[in-house]
């Protein structure tokens, strides 16, 4: 019976969309956002009809597994009416000793990122953070903020000018664990 328990548990987790990496105890918190709460105007985009502060939230994480050689952070809106979601922010090659990013780190001009970290182009076409700005009248969108523990120092296919979707694809092969915090925003 014990021989069947592990394969059955793995199968059930796969059906639920979970993985062993998700179950390793990694956590993500923010002083600027609680799980399931509305994102503040401070983080909302300043453009495309939105008038926010466009500041990336402060993020802190813990519980990275042994073998973590770098981190990546993303903010993704799966509710965007594009058919494939919308990438608001992707940062990769964050050094392994890093456990937080300060508020506003997504502004490439401020140079608040740890040395070696790369901010890719978001789906607005700019490098760094682009805050929430869903179409007016849409139901609130879910903004998934995820930190990834990565098994390589530098993602092999992602370069300085990499599109966010390419970085995401590269992360699929190199993620040891991840943690997600979801915020909501609508207008």
Roles of regions detected by a PLM:
Residues 1-5:
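Positively charged n-region of N-terminal signal peptides that target proteins for export
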Residues 7-17:
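Bacterial N-terminal signal peptides
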Residues 21-187:
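N-terminus-centered regions that define maturation/targeting leaders and the start
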